Amino acid sequence: LDRSAKARRKNNRPESRIRAPRLRAPESSMIPRYSRPEMTSIWEPQTRFKIWFEIEAHAADALAELGVIPKEAAQTIWAKAKDATFNVARIDEIERETKHDVIAFLTHLAEIVGPEARFVHQGMTSSDVLDTCLNVQLVRAADLLISDIDKVLAALKTRAFEHKMTPTIGRSHGIHAEPVTFGLKLAYAYAEFSRARERLVLARKEVATCAISGAVGTFAQIDPRVEEHVANAMGLIPEPISTQVIPRDRHAMYFATLGVIASSVERLATEIRHLQRTEVLEAEEFFSEGQKGSSAMPHKRNPVLSENLTGLSRMVRAYVTPALENVVLWHERDISHSSAERMIGPDATVTLDFALNRLAGLIDKLLIYPENMQKNLDRLGGLVHSQRLLIALTQKGASREDAYRLVQRNAMPVWRGEGDFQSLLKNDADVKKYLSDTEIEEQFDLGYHLKHVDTIFRRVFGAS
């Protein structure tokens, strides 16, 4: 026991511990299966270091114009590093010693630039670089996501007009309600994603700010004109007032917007999943030649893309909570937000980018079955016209309570599969006190429910 205790004490001494190598984690933990290179490239280390350099170099330009540093120094910084490929492994090596990523980068930059590197980062703090870079990346990600939404909108519009007047049953609580058209279902989604696009444009604007204001945001060591120059060069605007960091309520709004968009993705995906159920089969995901639906059941054709989108949407929404909690920082700044942002920035944007592109393709190739829609419309023997009969009876003098009772007592047998709704109504003496056979038949006109589809489409898509 004594020997064992001594061994434990020896192994716990600092000089006896084995230090595990610090490996650079991927900028996005999303697996390649759910990633697209267009978005992941925004978050690659080389991209980040390139942005860091541009921020530092533009700041040096401004300092040179103000006479703070020699103009030749600013020119040398650009000349020696603007086309450089930064050595990620070398930066990691330096960071293992310094325990500071920005210092590690600046040390490596000095190895590239030489003596003039002493004029880099003058009057700045790490967050000036980190926050401005993060916002550049979020803006670029937003631009790509806006383009993704445009693809979804284009697919929805095409299919909506294709099935503008294709009648189908509308459902509330999952139960047959009244007729709609399949085009209207897609128009609903089009309007929702149009709103999503508007919100994302606003969210992009919200994070398109730059802070080059020094250690606590007072510009004590750097002229505010440097911030203005860097902001203009990076496609941003100066943050009106920062502490050591850009306020995180901006980022919270950005990620909350991504979460709402993810919910819109899931809403449409869930609709498709329901419509593909065997008992419904009004629409179906495209099933390619050679595709397999089940390892056990060769007949299966499952809505796997929609189900996949449901899961990815959950992930995007999960990233919203850390963004909201990052708003709360100590005094002029703490670092509690940093670790969360290093994950949620890449992961939320990469995931949503993939989901939107998958959704656009799903809509574009969606198989639609109007004949099954008609079968489902007829399935309840005309019960979907019950509200019109209710209104017709009240207009002929029946109280609403009596009209409701008369329609319901004839509807319930049909609900149980006993008889035809129209025939039962025609044989109900109390109903016949108010409506003739012809008037009853007129209430079963499917076209009546679709008479304002054109109006709705003009509201959603415009006059064209």
Regions found by a protein language model. Name each.
Residues 69, 74, 280-281, 399:
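Conserved hydrophobic residue
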